[in-house]
Amino acid sequence: MTNFEKIIAQNKLKTNAVLATYCVIFAFIGLLVDVIRINANDLGTALFKLMTFQIFPTITIIMFLVAFVIIVVCIQNFSSIMLSGDEYKLIDKSKVLSSKENQIHRLLLELLEEAKLHFEPKLYIIKAPYMNAFASGWNESNSLIALTSALIERLDRDELKAVIAHELSHIRHNDIRLTMCVGILSNIMLLVANFSVYFFMGNRKNSGANLARMILLVLQIILPFLTLLLQMYLSRTREYMADSGAAFLMHDNKPMIRALQKISNDYANNDYKGVDQNSTRSAAYLFSAEMFSTHPSIKNRIQSLSRRVI
């Protein structure tokens, strides 16, 4: 196993730990609301009975069902959401392509062959003045990779290939699916924690229900910061994985490093704030210049790539 394969394996373990934490917090919030709903006398006993289905955890089940429905709706519309608000072009190999369009399509095919993948993501060019890229899609069959026109014009062949390899790695690692699920769980948790305390105010304030209400009040303060930290940690872990995946496919870390440096310098020398109003897409970009970005800093990404041996 190469160092790049090791870092991917290590980051998968970290991802699983974060996902498990999300699911535990999500279920715990639902169970606390159920404790308030049944007006329990003892918190511990009520939680045990709810978890063992001696008492049906109605709110908890509803929360999971709502999350499932929202995920299904997002699956149907995610790609159109990601591409909305911009002039974009599908690279359709059945039509006449420009030299640049031919080039990026050939680069994608080379990477698919190198990775022994049996699917081909749709390839889009977004007309934009900034250099960036993103991947989208719930699974391989509806996946896509989008590159901005500025990125295609300013990167050389190997750098472009590295960027496409990075986005292809996101698809291979199911990062888009993961990001979507975590975002939905976070929003539902925040909504339930913020509003559920007031839904059952008419209940008698038995000690168990009252304690559950107090815990939810504390979570109202803690959850926004906790979910932000978890999302940042998770997303940064996946970016390191995608960088490593790109270098592994390229058999060289230098093209990815050069691409990151050029993109970073482009944002440093130009003010693109407000150019892209699509916040969902902005979070998925290869590079983000925001202070509280879900992406690691370019410096850390380059350091991580530089110390890995292929």
Curated annotation (Swiss-Prot):
Active site per database record: E167
GO biological process, one term: proteolysis
Main location per the UniProt record: membrane
Cofactor(s) in the UniProt record: Zn(2+)
Membrane topology: Multi-pass membrane protein
GO cellular component, one term: plasma membrane
Co-factor remark: Binds 1 zinc ion per subunit.
Enzyme Commission number(s) of this protein: 3.4.24.-
GO MF, one annotated term: metalloendopeptidase activity
Keyword check for Transferase: no
InterPro entries tied to this protein: HtpX_protease (IPR050083), Pept_M48_protease_HtpX (IPR022919), Peptidase_M48 (IPR001915)
Family label: Belongs to the peptidase M48B family.
Protein's name according to its UniProt entry: Protease HtpX homolog
